[in-house]
Swiss-Prot record:
PANTHER family in alphabetical order: APURINIC-APYRIMIDINIC ENDONUCLEASE, ENDONUCLEASE IV ENDODEOXYRIBONUCLEASE IV
Recorded GO MF terms: deoxyribonuclease IV (phage-T4-induced) activity; DNA binding; DNA-(apurinic or apyrimidinic site) endonuclease activity; phosphoric diester hydrolase activity; zinc ion binding
Cofactor names: Zn(2+)
Protein name, entry field: Probable endonuclease 4
UniProt superkingdom: Archaea
Binding site for Zn(2+) 2: E142, D176, H211, E256
Length: 276
């Protein structure tokens, strides 16, 4: 089954998130559990959560993906910034315990001239404190484009974080197609090679989701500018190969393209037609 969704709003609640996803022929959805700029999250409404659970129990929607606020930086040089990131992360994980089958995706962070090794140490230290044995949510490290001092451009950097996690069974990876292409992995001309490299360094069992985005800029550009499907430098042929690849096709895919809800519906219809 092709599991495809898009980044949608929870401003009208979680049940509405599921209903809106189904209305655009999606069977999963990504959302911000709070403002992408941080701040307090709205209190959970149990009836609303129950509505989402019932919807997921009775449809093909099996999993949802929460995306951490962009401001989170567990690798920051500033202790205040790290503490704020930790508090948001911890609160989000506690809230997600109350939601149906879900994962929590985050940008690993930027080391801000401290060096990659120090940044990796700070991230893994925080994750070891955040991860609980009774936690239901799987935490996903996202592949990054390599802007500035971002950590996570290379598979080696992500693996260096994961190998330091005590309860690493609760940690996975989300590949962003725009990010890895901008970061230097040629998924257009050598998708098999990139997948094999990921498998040899991290392991395909860690790959839990894919952000399916075209890229406004070219290979190794380190720009991180998403483009609509088929309108960027990755192109429709490579995207078709990605969604149909035998090692990727059963993963959940999430659109983060520059679109409104109707635009997402058009892309989902297009991709469903290309899925074989």
């Amino acid at each position: 089954m092709f599991t495809i969704g898009a980044h949608l709003s929870i401003s009208k609640g979680f049940e509405n998130l599921g209903l809106e996803a189904l209305s655009i022929d999606a069977n999963t959805a990504q959302f911000f559990p709070r403002s992408p700029r941080g701040g307090k999250a709205k209190p959970l409404n149990q009836a609303d959560v129950d509505g989402l659970q019932e919807l997921m129990d009775n449809t093909t929607m099996d999993v949802i993906l929460a995306h951490a606020p962009y401001i989170i930086n567990l690798a920051s040089k500033s202790e205040k910034t790290r503490n704020n990131a930790y508090e948001i992360f911890e609160d989000d994980l506690k809230r997600l315990d109350n939601l149906p089958n879900n994962m929590y995706n985050f940008h690993p962070g930027s080391h801000v001239q401290q060096g990659v090794e120090k940044g990796i140490e700070l991230i893994s230290d925080s994750l070891n404190k955040l991860i609980r044995e009774d936690m239901k949510t799987t935490i996903l490290l996202e592949t990054m484009a390599g802007k500035g001092t971002e950590i996570g451009r290379t598979f080696e950097e992500l693996e260096s974080i994961i190998e330091k996690i005590d309860m690493d069974e609760k940690v996975g990876v989300c590949i962003d197609t725009c990010h890895i292409y901008d970061g230097g992995y040629d998924i257009v001309n050598d998708l098999d090679g990139v997948i094999d490299e990921f498998d040899s360094i991290i392991g395909l069992d860690r790959l839990k989701a894919i952000h399916l985005n075209d890229s406004k800029y070219g290979l190794n550009s380190h720009k991180d500018r998403h483009e609509k499907i088929g309108m960027g430098k990755i192109g429709i042929d490579a995207i078709t190969e990605i969604i149909n690849h035998k090692k990727l096709r059963d993963l959940p895919f999430y659109l983060e393209t520059p679109n409104d809800v109707e635009g997402y519906k058009e892309e989902i219809d297009l991709l469903r037609g290309l899925y074989k």
